[in-house]
Amino acid sequence: MSSKEVKTALKSARDAIRNKEYKEALKHCKTVLKQEKNNYNAWVFIGVAAAELEQPDQAQGAYKKAAELEPEQLLAWQGLASLYEKCNQVNAKDDLPGVYQKLLDLYESADRQKWCDVCKKLVALYHQEKKHLEVARTWHRLIKTRQEDGADRQELYELWRKLSQLLAENIEDQNNETQQMLLTAFENALDLADNIPSEDHQVLYRNFIQCLSKFPHETTKLKKACEEMIAIYPTVQYPLEVICLYLIDSGSLTSEGHQYCCKLVEMNSKSGPGLIGLGIIALQDKKYEDAVRHLTEGLKESPVCIAGWCHLAEAQVKMHRPKEAILSCNQALKTIDNFGASGGNLHQKNLCLRLKAEALLKLSDGASSEEAVRTLDQVSDVDNTPGLLVLQGLACLNTGAVDKATKIMEDLVTSYPDLAEAHALEGRVHFTKKDYVQAEVSFQRALEKDAEVAEYHYQLGLTYWFMGEETRKDKTKALTHFLKAARLDAHMGKVFCYLGHYYRDVAGDRNRARGCYRKAFELDDNDAESGAAAVDLSLELEDTETALAILTAVTQKASAGAAKWAWLRRGLYHLKAGQHSQAVADLQAALRADPKDCNCWESLGEAYLSRGGYTTALKSFMKASELNPDSTYSVFKVAAIQQILGRYSEAIAQYQLIIKMKEDYVPALKGLGECHLLLGKVALVDFLDGKAVDYVEQALGYFTRALQHRADVSCLWKLVGDACTCLHPVSPSKVHVHVLGALLGQKEGQEVLKKEELLSLGGRCYGRALKLMSTSNTWCDLGINYYRQVQHLAETGSSMSDLTELLEKSLHCLKKAVRLDSNNHLHWNALGVVACYRGVGNYALAQHCFIKSIQAEQINAAAWTNLGVLYLATENIEQAHEAFKMAQSLDPSYLLCWIGQALIAERVGSYDTMDLFRHTTELSMHTEGAIGYAYWVCTTLQDKSNRETELYQYNILEMNAIPAAQGVLCKYVERIQNSASAFTMLGYLNEHLQLKKEAAEAYQRATTLLHSAEDQNTYNVAVRNWGRLLCSIGDYDRAIQAFKSTPLVELEDIIGFALALFMKGLYKESGSAYERALAVCKSEQDKAHILTAMAIVEYKQGKMDAAKSFLFKCSILKEPTAESLQALCALGLAMRDATLSKAALNELLKHIKRRNDYHSCLLMSAIYALQGHSVAVQRQVAKAVHSNPADPALWSLLSRIVAQYTQRSAKGGAVAGNVAHILDLNHGKKALLYTAVNQLAMGSSTAEDKSNTALKTIQKAAFLSPDDPAVWAGLMAACHADDKLALLNNTQPKRVDLYLALRSAVAASLKDKEILQNYNQSLEKWSFSQVVTGLIDTGKTSEAESLCTQSLKSNPDQPAVILLLRQVQCMSLLESQKPLPDAVLEELQKTVMSNSTSVPAWQWLAQVYQSQGMMGAAEMCYRKSLQVASQQGNWSGKLSSLLKLALLALEVCMANVSGDHWSSLVQEATSEALKVCFSPLAVFLQALLQFNRKMGARETRRLLERIVYQTGYPSSIVSAARWYLLRHLYAKDDPELIDVLVRNAETHGDKRILELNRKLSAQ
């Protein structure tokens, strides 16, 4: 290609680029390059086209190639620069500065404007990359070029200003050359500025000063710049702030600096630098308050001023505010750490650390001193600075390191003998060692070196304060130095504290002392000692306002748990002022500060007590007592509060603790006496008179001991009088009180006082109290005492003349009490009561007194009641009713007004009488209310005709009247023991409650009281009642004697006598007595009863015909009684004459309304049982239950019948027993036993139900009926069954050692039970067999054998015991697995034959034969047991025999013995068992037979799956069936069914099957 063609191609390429046909341009360029490889323009065009086509690498290569070819040509470099500017690649940015430099070189001579543009681009690039030096140099070159080009002043100003802006960032990272160029830029810009002053110029100056402030070496320029700016802009704060901060940091605040600060503060009162500067100047002038104020305010505005914090800390240390100083130092150190450690900062840091250590040492506590040591360790070059070594020594002293402090002190004194601080430290060391003489010398040396240090004077004064005896007496030296210290340092609070001590304790000037203490506290509000002393002295000087002001000021700013002294004192102040709630709050705050201050707890207790918070006060005093067990006061207050709260026993225990510490502590003795007296009064209210007497006796003992120490205390004598008088209601026979001789005027010993003597002693003690202090209350108590003496003498039969003098004395005393205090309603009331007494009978005076009492106290139920009694006594019924009604309205719970209303109702014959008396007994116990209620209950009970009335239902049944009346009457006779009618009523009520022994005792007491009475008929009735009850409780001899003591003419006496003879076993005499009664008897019904009784007497003598004859006579009477027909029916049963029994029962059913009642049902069932109809027995009772479902007796009977006759319905029997127990507890006691027996009869199915086991049921029965031998026997059976079940479940039996204990319980329960001897003997035999069986099962054969042998020794003729003995003896032989000799087998056979009616005996013999391999003999024995069970109707025996027979045959089958006999026997026995009842075991045995015949047969699987998957089978049988089914399935190789079976086993937790599955699957 020719050169012309090349030019044409290049032209085409240029045109293509212009037309944006870049690819076309590339083609042309490539064409050119094929001809001329080094064509510059072609390479440039390729670069342009590639760049436009976004192919930067190709473009870069092309431009570089072009630049290489012609480096002095611009096009390639311009293209490369443009490419790099657009490209974001890292290497492009790295290469761009070089490209710009090349362009600068090319443009410098060619185009100055473009040179400037490239230069600015290059600077921007350098600035972006933070190449500050290159920025400075390049921009400086630009300025120089523009200067050469003749740029104007404004342009140059802008260029220098721009340079200052470019370099002002990141000054800290710049080198010295760059920084100098920056300053030059600012200076030139300022010089070239035209608009002065102006906003831009001000900003520029501000930036210049800000820049200078960052250059520590340019302080001169900084100061100059600030001064210049201040001159130009006098109202601008910034330069002033900068120069102030500079002067502050440099520590060169002169008068000039002071002017700057003042000017700054004038311009802005909140200027931080200005205030800090003023604070530092104030500190230099020792104006510490101003310094702290200015510095604190300044640092709020300028918190990063390290020098400010340091100076603030220094000022605070000078003002003895160590805690504040520590905070300031910490803030300074934090700021230093944030700004980094330069040389200046290091100095400031050391200064801060020193100040912090000094402040910490002023706190004086160990923790602060330890921190001071750690702080000093951070100071550099501490070992070479004496001042720091002194601080280190003081820190060691405060932490207890005296030896180390001594070493530091000695080194300092040696190295710096002229250093005052060293000698002061020496003095401190000696002072700590209590070597005050040497301390004095050292402090004097320190003062010689520097006499103007307040601390040295204070320490010397302190040394004199604690020095020897002379100085202690004369503290003038101490005072002198304290005063000098106070003069030198007016902020040293502790010196003013000791000045306060001096003026208070030595000079006795309390006003001046208070002033010193207040000054000390003002200086240091943490000085609790000074504050407390100031408050205490203010209170002593009666300046409560000042004291309260101090306390309030402290408590308001105190944090939680602080200022205990202030809270405590303010609390005590409020307590004294009666402001109890505020006192409580303050004392609680004090306790938050010190929870272990027992005094504080005591004060809080007093505060609670003052506002009536007894419980909280009690807790407070108890806490105080815990903290200080030796504090008598705390324990006493605990006891006193418990006494107030009515916790007398606890109070007594506390008082006893005090008496152990101080035997003669009279308040505790008095408290003990009061508590026992109060307990006695409580016992009197509860009618526990014996207890009351004992408590009063103890109270008198304590009061006497107190009087031995303080006989001059009136209240003690009054309390003795109260104790003697309070027993007035107690029966004289119970009052025998031991009184110490000291109370009776004797020197030693004690006497027993009766009631009369005790009341008289009470009167004398009241008199003694009146001699010491005459009060209206004591006069009233004395008057009441005389009145009680009169009452007692009247009860004992004294004549009225003997009582007159005492009554006059009583009236005189009560009138005296009224005169002394006419507004006391109790005095008027007491006077009215005495005026009513029959020996006085002054009703007008009594009425006047009661009215005066009401006037004195409007709410006065007692006075209204007494007024009502007065009206009732005078037959004014309506007025009495109104008075009682008024009393009721005032106090509905006041008992006596209700008794008054009840008496009125009784008098007028109201139906509400009984209800009112009942209400009185519900309110409280009172003799009148009790006897009234008991009388009306007995009266209602005696009326047999009202049983169906609503009145009877409500008053007797619903209100539970009988036990309620019996309860109150018991209390009545406890106190009033001479009322025969009360004892008779009590006996009658006890009879109704089946409390026969108690009834007999009550009747006996009535008989004794009536023995000498004139009314012989009443006496005979009492004896009759007594005899009847003696007979009921089995005391027949005394019953016979009682009835013999009567004339025996009344029918009731004769039949009672006859019954007693009968029960004693004297049947002939009893029969004669009944004949005598029959002769006297007039009523047909009574005759029938007597004939029935005579028939029973004949029956007892074995005269059946005579008995039948008497009963037939009864039946032919006009009105035969149900009892006689029942007796005839029972006689038929006893004679086993079903026809007679049935005829009698049919006749009986004609005469009774309810055919299905318990007795008729029992008789009918007995007849069916006699006829052998077991199912009919159950049906009869079930029918009766259906007719009377609410009768618990019938449900109980049904449960018993099922257990005895139809065990197959045991589940129903258990349910019936539970129903009986729910309906009625009395029947339910026995029903629980029947329930348990039925549960046992149900077998293991109930045992698997953990919530309903026979064992739990029988345990409940034993708890409710511990005297029933059958219950203990049942418990033995339940334990045995539980142990068997445990073995079945492969667990350890729990009750293996209970059998002998339970047999002992059975034997103990059978003692003295003469009724049903045959039943008892059978029970005892069964229990014996059960014990032996249990011992055999648990492996205790030797004990079982010993038990059997002992039983046979006492009675050899016991076939059952012999059988048990042979079973025990055979155990060891069978365990040896040796064949038994024929002789042994023959002996065993004989033993079983002697027990041929025993099913278990034949089964046991069969098991013996089976163990010997004698299967035929075993089969014969099982068949024999089956025969015996069938003959006896023994359902369970029959079932067990069949199952055991089937098991025997199956064992033979599984031994693969040939023949069909045994397999057919299995089938036959199990089929018969299933006919008896559904038996899971029988079904399982059939399945096993099939498994043995054809293991893999489908029938085998069907039978086993029925057991495994159907419900109703016990878990043990199901588990065994799973075992065989799994073997069957593996034999059939059926994995699907195997998985189903394994899942079933997992669900039921059958581990045995899972283990078998693992073994079979591994084979």
Swiss-Prot record:
Pfam assignment, any one: TPR_16
Broad class of the protein's primary localization: cytoplasm
Record function comment: Component of the SKI complex, a multiprotein complex that assists the RNA-degrading exosome during the mRNA decay and quality-control pathways. The SKI complex catalyzes mRNA extraction from 80S ribosomal complexes in the 3'-5' direction and channels mRNA to the cytosolic exosome for degradation. SKI-mediated extraction of mRNA from stalled ribosomes allow binding of the Pelota-HBS1L complex and subsequent ribosome disassembly by ABCE1 for ribosome recycling. In the nucleus, the SKI complex associates with transcriptionally active genes in a manner dependent on PAF1 complex (PAF1C).
UniProt signal peptide: none
UniProt-recorded name of the protein: Superkiller complex protein 3
GO cellular component: cytosol; euchromatin; nucleoplasm; Ski complex
Alphabetically ordered keywords of this record: Acetylation, Cytoplasm, Nucleus, Repeat, TPR repeat
Subunit organization: Component of the SKI complex which consists of SKIC2, SKIC3 and SKIC8. Interacts with PAF1.
GO biological process, one term: rescue of stalled ribosome
Residues that bear N-acetylserine: 2
Compartment annotation: Cytoplasm; Nucleus
InterPro entries given in the database record: Ski3/TTC37, TPR-like_helical_dom_sf, TPR_rpt
TPR repeat ranges per the UniProt record: 6-39, 40-73, 157-196, 272-305, 307-339, 386-419, 420-453, 455-492, 493-527, 564-597, 598-631, 632-665, 633-665, 673-713, 790-824, 826-860, 861-894, 980-1013, 1020-1053, 1055-1084, 1325-1358, 1399-1432
Family: Belongs to the SKI3 family.
